[in-house]
Swiss-Prot record:
Subunit annotation: Part of the 30S ribosomal subunit. Forms a tight heterodimer with protein bS6.
Record's signal peptide: none
One Gene Ontology term, aspect cellular component: cytosolic small ribosomal subunit
Organism: Rhodospirillum rubrum (strain ATCC 11170 / ATH 1.1.1 / DSM 467 / LMG 4362 / NCIMB 8255 / S1)
PROSITE patterns cross-referenced by the UniProt entry: RIBOSOMAL_S18
GO molecular function, one term: structural constituent of ribosome
Name of protein: Small ribosomal subunit protein bS18
GO biological process per UniProt: translation
Listed Pfam families: Ribosomal_S18
UniProt KW keywords: Ribonucleoprotein, Ribosomal protein, RNA-binding, rRNA-binding
């Protein structure tokens, strides 16, 4: 008896956390929000991992860089 063919597992694509009603606004002063998108070493996490849209990823990167420049966020975390 043959086993039934397996269907491939599709991981559901997460939606952008910054789109939709009630979504937080990207602001360079909101350090708690920005830290969610920075790795433990201080690097900006890519959008394929965080599921942020391309437009919002650019906004996020700009906000993180602004916060770093103003010493609100460190460039490197230890």
């Amino acid at each position: 008896m043959m086993a039934a063919p397996r269907r491939p597992f599709f991981r559901r694509r997460k939606t952008c956390p910054f789109s939709g009603a009630g979504a937080p606004k990207i602001d360079y002063k909101d350090i708690k929000l920005l830290l969610r998108f920075v790795s433990e070493r201080g690097k900006i996490v890519p959008s394929r991992i965080t599921a942020v849209s391309a437009k919002k990823q650019r906004e996020l990167a700009r906000a993180i860089k602004r916060a770093r420049f103003l010493s609100l966020l460190p460039y490197v975390l230890k």
